Amino acid sequence: DYDSKNHTTREAVLHQQAEKLAELKASGRDVMIRQGNDYAAVQATLITDMDFDGGQYSIIDEYVPFYPLALHSRVSYTGASLNLADDAEEVLLRSAEVGAGLQYTLTAQSARVLQDSTYSEFYGADASLVLDDITAQVAQYRQALSGIFNQEMTGHERVGNVTITTYANGTRVYV
């Protein structure tokens, strides 16, 4: 809130938030953030809805997963919720490319009540309809990518339409 008697700069708020996140981490608590800024990422245990591109720049013709390269094995991260994504296959493949965990958004009650509401984007979140498929998808994903989640990402290259991500243990993931 704006308070004309007590101004707080963005820089001061940044430092306050960074201090609080550091305190939480130092106390042994897990810290989950959504997207997050650079100062928050270093204190996080999990980053959800991470932008794998690290921002869009019109002068760059090719995508380089800078944030995943910098953070992999140091912080766990996910992309968008697969069951709510416009293109779930694209999110799944990009997640595999950058060694991300999978994220889903679920409701315990029927999502039909959301159909004509301002929360209609959660219509695909009905756990009773998707939980079995999600369980199978997560098991397959974990099996396919076992051994990379705790490994530093050491390389990322594009060969034609295929990306190759290399990890410290020598594992290569082709997408």
Explain the meaning of each model-derived region:
Residues D3-V175:
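Active-site-proximal substrate-binding groove within the catalytic cores of carbohydrate-active enzymes
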